[in-house]
């Protein structure tokens, strides 16, 4: 069986052409199928969903069939219909199937003829902010648009199936202003694989009271969803909600290429694009199919440097003007502007464009700038690299969702005579311990033996140090002032700190 599910609807909104390529997954390569980062993000989502279910106890789970090849939408919907005959009921993964549209809701709470439709997401928010979902410009905040249209689709399908019911849509999100009131909250929800290699979560509590205070926030989004349905909010200027449902349902069921106009942001991050390591393999590139169809590109054109990999290029107007190759660009197209004493953003872009256009493979070195920078270095040179974690369900009492946890660093020294020394390292493997303050104290001891210049592996290290500084300020640890002074001496403030 096939249908337009909510995941397919979401994918189709990103670009309707993607839905055609995912329809034909045996033909087209998809980089997201092998992305470990996305798999890790999904694991956090599974944990939050299980945590959310416990806030609505007594629910009945509509379980997936063990064999995904016999996934029967109608059977799942029939199970849901049977449960809805009860006056009051809580259902996890309720299923609704009508007119080739299929959705499953994370949590459904039925009381008489009123239904709460609750979509659980691991995304965080501060509920006190006034413009979380709709900005001051009266438009949906772009980062929330996929979630809100997903919720609108679920509400729409549920109303089609239950026209006499009142449906209230909610997003259940992580409240980043709340703190865990128990230790080990994250570890109550263990991510595991079943024998069929499907990801699940094992819940390791006997009673909901073990979870402490609820760190989720439930937001009623009836008004926003209604405006999406009415066409007041659109995903694209030329496609309202009902048009999107019709178009994407047709693509899904009829399996045709919609020839949706290529758009810079979607094409730049298209998951159906093959990199050099995948070239020559059996599966085809959906990205190439689009450009051969819409722009009549030949295989030779794909070898020409395009605008899609120009560093930090974000202007969609270039593509709208038909400027797709670096060879077509002029300095005016990227608003070229020099900066005193450093390489500006657009200078950096133009260097890349010129060199690739002219087949110039020599490295660019700002010799004067580099020399001026190196003249400020003090030996020995210190190199630090951090390993950290950030999770929606905190590990420790008093910590907020998505707070940074720094559990490991390595420290190497480059001496003036050329010697490289692996000088220090730290790793905290103590279960249940909050490592951050011990981490930075160890780092202070490692780096306070001389005045050598400190190099961080990336901006990540600076971000972590600032996050720990914020945590220290809110703590009563005896050495807080010394550690804060140390952090301020080796880092620079960020927008959040």
Question: Residue ranges of each PLM-predicted region?
Answer:
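N-terminal accessory regions of nucleic-acid-interacting proteins
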Residues: 297-380
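Activity-critical C-terminal alpha-helical subdomain
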Residues: 471, 478-497
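Short helix/loop capping segments that flank catalytic or ligand/cofactor-binding pockets
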Residues: 21-22, 128, 277-281, 319-320, ...
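Metal-dependent nuclease catalytic cores that hydrolyze phosphodiester bonds in DNA/RNA
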Residues: 1-115, 305-310, 315-343
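Polybasic (Lys/Arg-rich)
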Residues: 209-263
């Amino acid at each position: 069986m096939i249908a337009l599910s909510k995941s397919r609807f979401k994918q189709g909104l990103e670009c309707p052409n993607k839905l055609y390529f995912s329809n034909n997954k045996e033909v087209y390569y998809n980089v997201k199928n092998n992305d470990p980062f996305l798999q890790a993000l999904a694991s956090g989502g599974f944990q939050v969903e299980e945590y959310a279910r416990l806030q609505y106890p007594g629910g009945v789970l509509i379980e997936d069939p063990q064999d995904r090849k016999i996934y029967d939408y109608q059977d799942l919907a029939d199970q849901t219909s049977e449960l809805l005959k009860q006056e009051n009921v809580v259902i996890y993964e309720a299923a609704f199937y009508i007119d080739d549209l299929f959705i499953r809701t994370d949590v459904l709470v039925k009381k008489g003829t009123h239904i709460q439709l609750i979509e659980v997401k691991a995304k965080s928010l501060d509920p006190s902010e006034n413009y979380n979902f709709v900005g001051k410009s009266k438009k949906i905040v772009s980062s929330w648009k996929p979630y809100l249209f997903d919720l609108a689709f679920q509400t729409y399908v549920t109303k089609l199936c239950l026209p006499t019911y009142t449906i209230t849509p909610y997003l259940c999100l992580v409240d980043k202003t709340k703190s865990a009131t128990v230790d080990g909250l994250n570890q109550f929800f263990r991510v595991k694989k079943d024998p069929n290699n499907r990801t699940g979560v094992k819940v390791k509590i006997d009673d909901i009271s073990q979870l402490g205070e609820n760190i989720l926030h439930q937001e009623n989004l009836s008004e926003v969803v209604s405006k999406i349905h009415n066409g007041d909010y659109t995903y694209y200027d030329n496609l309202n909600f009902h048009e999107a449902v019709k178009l994407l349902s047709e693509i899904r069921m009829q399996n045709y290429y919609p020839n949706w106009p290529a758009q810079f942001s979607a094409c730049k991050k298209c998951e159906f694009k093959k990199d050099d390591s995948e070239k020559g393999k059996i599966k085809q590139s959906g990205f190439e199919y689009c450009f051969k169809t819409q722009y009549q590109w030949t295989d030779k054109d794909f070898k020409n440097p395009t605008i899609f990999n120009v560093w930090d290029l974000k202007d969609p107007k270039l593509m709208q003007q038909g400027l797709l190759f670096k060879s077509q660009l002029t300095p005016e197209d990227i608003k070229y502007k020099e900066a005193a004493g450093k390489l500006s953003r657009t200078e950096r872009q133009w260097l890349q464009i010129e060199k690739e256009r002219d087949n110039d493979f020599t490295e660019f070195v700002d010799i004067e700038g580099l020399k001026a920078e190196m003249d400020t270095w003090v030996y020995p040179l210190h190199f630090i690299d951090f390993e950290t974690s950030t999770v929606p369900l905190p590990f420790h009492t008093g910590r907020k969702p998505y707070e940074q946890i720094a559990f490991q660093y390595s420290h190497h020294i480059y001496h003036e005579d050329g010697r490289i020394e692996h000088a220090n390292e730290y790793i905290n493997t103590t279960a249940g311990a909050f490592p951050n303050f011990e981490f930075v104290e160890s780092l202070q001891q490692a780096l306070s033996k001389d005045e050598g210049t400190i190099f961080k592996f990336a901006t990540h290290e600076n971000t972590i140090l600032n996050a720990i500084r914020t945590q220290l300020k809110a703590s009563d640890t005896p050495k807080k002032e010394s550690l804060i002074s140390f952090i301020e001496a080796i880092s620079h403030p960020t927008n959040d700190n």
